């Protein structure tokens, strides 16, 4: 089934100039980049995006990190885009990620793990809408 999903290239990967390699891996996997923007989140924007984690002990650290430098937000489209992007990312903890996945290759820690991806279609819809309006997405 054709799906859209949302990805963020996180501050650690952007600062290490890995954006091009990660975008190339997205396309090489057969997913189509239909929207893209680079921005520097404020702490409040990061908190709004990660509001689902507000009560978790790592929330402040996560929002500090996600607002520490530029990120690249991407909308991906393709057959089964959500699970395909999650498989390409690998496990959240880079130490546990399968070899060859983006987090195994580029992740530095549980938090600085290079990339974010939506965990379900419903989450993807919220996350895409948080950063993009319909005019910014071109199939």
Curated annotation (Swiss-Prot):
GO terms for biological process: CTP biosynthetic process; GTP biosynthetic process; UTP biosynthetic process. Pfam families: NDK. The active site is at residue 116. Major role in the synthesis of nucleoside triphosphates other than ATP. The ATP gamma phosphate is transferred to the NDP beta phosphate via a ping-pong mechanism, using a phosphorylated active-site intermediate. InterPro entries: NDK-like_dom (IPR034907), NDK-like_dom_sf (IPR036850), Nucleoside_diP_kinase (IPR001564). This is Nucleoside diphosphate kinase. It comes from Desulfovibrio desulfuricans (strain ATCC 27774 / DSM 6949 / MB). GO terms for cellular component: cytoplasm. NCBIfam families: PRK00668.1. Belongs to the NDK family. It comes from the Bacteria. It is found in: Cytoplasm. It is an enzyme of class 2 (transferase). SMART domains: NDK. Its cofactor is Mg(2+). ATP binds at residues 10, 58, 86, 92, 103, 113. Its EC number is 2.7.4.6. Keywords: ATP-binding, Cytoplasm, Kinase, Magnesium, Metal-binding, Nucleotide metabolism, Nucleotide-binding, Phosphoprotein, Transferase.
């Amino acid at each position: 089934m054709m799906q859209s999903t949302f990805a963020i290239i996180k501050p650690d990967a952007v600062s290490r100039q890995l954006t091009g390699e990660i975008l190339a891996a997205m396309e090489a996997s057969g997913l189509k980049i239909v929207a893209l923007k680079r921005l520097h989140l404020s702490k409040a924007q990061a908190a709004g995006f990660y509001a689902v984690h507000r009560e978790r002990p790592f929330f402040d650290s996560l929002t500090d990190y996600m607002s520490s430098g530029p990120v690249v937000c991407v909308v991906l489209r393709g057959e089964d885009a959500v699970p395909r992007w999650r498989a390409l990312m690998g496990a959240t903890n880079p130490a546990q990620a399968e070899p060859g996945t983006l987090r195994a290759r580029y992740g530095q820690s549980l938090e600085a793990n290079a990339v974010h991806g939506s965990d379900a279609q419903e989450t993807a819809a919220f996350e895409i809408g948080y950063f993009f309006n319909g005019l910014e997405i071109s199939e």
